[in-house]
Amino acid sequence: MTKKSHFLKTNYKPLKELIKIKNIPNPTIQDISNLVKEIRSSKLPDPKIIGNCWSFFKNPIISKNKLEKISSIHKLIPFYKLSDEKYKIPAAWLIEKCGMKGRIEGQTGTHKEHALVIINLCAATGTEIYNFSQKIKKLVLKKFNILLEEEVNIID
């Protein structure tokens, strides 16, 4: 905890829209936290119903040069400008473009509505989930030359 002033980043479109809908003119840190949870809950499966840990991979940050190379092939690539030379690309978009959205293999797969969510269909082992995640990483690396980084903690 700190008493310092914080700058709250509220430029994420769904967050801005929800702040407006709920008429919160000066959102607090707690407001933002609650709204982000609400947004995620509306987009992602409930782990109590379908085993998952929400976003499995981080959104990669790439160079302007790499973005230009990818966008020459994929005109509608979504991205967020971080600086003149750094851009963030949604990992879910990369995974979907590799044909892995909604893909099921054995007892694991990606969620049908969000490619970034790896699901456990009831009986998948940690090894099966890990191997599936590595398959996704290899496909994205091969197609886009981007190495995805896990957002989850991998425990041996």
Predicted features by range, described:
Residues M1-I118, A123-T127, K143, L147-D156:
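Phosphate/pyrophosphate- and phosphate-bearing ligand-binding catalytic cores of soluble enzymes
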